[in-house]
């Protein structure tokens, strides 16, 4: 995994696994809503009443409907550390 994906992939994966509703804002200002069904290096599959394949280069912002906590590398060892308090 490249350096550029060290935050993106765990963030999207947490949103996917926890089925967190998200608003995705595109670079042209359009707002899409749904939950992340899947993603890869280039696209995000957003599920609402239908599934939409959204190219990552068109995404400006991903806004979760509720706060999410990203797993940190030390979580698997300690389980109680807060992100940013390493």
Curated annotation (Swiss-Prot):
Keywords: RNA-binding, Stress response. One of its GO terms (molecular function) is RNA binding. Residues 9-68 form the Sm domain. It holds the Pfam family Hfq. Belongs to the Hfq family. Homohexamer. This is RNA-binding protein Hfq.
């Amino acid at each position: 995994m490249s350096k550029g994906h060290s935050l993106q992939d765990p963030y999207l994966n947490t949103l996917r696994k926890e089925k967190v509703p998200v608003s995705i804002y595109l670079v042209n200002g359009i707002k899409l809503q749904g939950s992340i069904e899947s993603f890869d290096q280039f696209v995000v599959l957003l599920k609402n009443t239908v599934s939409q394949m959204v190219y990552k280069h068109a995404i400006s912002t991903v806004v979760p409907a509720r706060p999410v906590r990203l797993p940190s590398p030390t979580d698997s060892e300690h389980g109680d550390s807060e992100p940013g308090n390493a």
